[in-house]
Amino acid sequence: MTINQIVRVIPVLKVNNRNVNQDFYEETLGMKVLVEEGALLSLGDASNVEKIVLEESPSMRSRKVEGPKKLKRIVVKVGETQEIDYLLARKPQTTALYQGANGRAFEVVSPQGDRILVHAEEELESLEPLEEAPLVVVPDDFTGLTAFEVAFLEVNVPDPAQAKKLYETADLTGFVHVKEAQGEDLQLENNVTWDLSTIKVELAAFDVEALRESLGDAVEFVHRKGSFMIVKDTSRIELWFEGKQGRVHISYES
């Protein structure tokens, strides 16, 4: 699928309480709210480019995952290493702390139970466990991350070989790493639980016909104007392919 060069992947996470999760992503992770639209909240950095979306789904519509979640971990790479120290100076509740070649790194768990690793390394292998990070003086003008990307997602699947076939065809293996796990909720429809529901795949150029042909029966929907296409993987996670956007938008006219 080289004709459709991937720019980034944007996870869409279903959450029970958007406000509680919003506070976590802003305060603990230094992310910026870009757009609020109904149940959806778009998060990014100083570039105003969307990187993560939260979708509130109350308990009468969705429920807590039983067993392992589809989303094993989000790995976030930060552009300015020093800003990780600024976040650590806020004394977040970390589950792991590391020292890497470029600086510190840490892992946290969101109020919805999603694991997020924040680092600034070229190679994750450089990370070594760290007992305690030195506290630094935070500049008065630091309000959040200047730049970050979702480097990749780790996704739990019952059958990694089967799941990899689709991700290989879509050239997504660098952005979605499948991990073998067993659980009753791993193959439910994406609206049932508070979990990873959608992966938006932003493409530099979007040749919808070429992509539809390569993905075949996995394609569930193509917008009538060809502006986006929806595929479902073996875990019923939606893959939402679209061309690179000049502005943030988190919903569409069908």
Predicted regions and their residues:
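A generic structural signal for short beta-strands and their flanking turns/coil linkers
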Residues: K70-K72
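Conserved acetyl-CoA-binding loop of GNAT-fold acetyltransferases
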Residues: T28-L34, P92-T95, E168-F175, G216-V219
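Vicinal oxygen chelate
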Residues: N16-N19, I74-R115, V157-Q162, Q182, ...
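Short, conserved acidic/polar surface loops in the N-terminal third of protein domains
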Residues: Y86-L87, L117-A120, P129
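Conserved small-residue-rich
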Residues: Y25, F142-L188
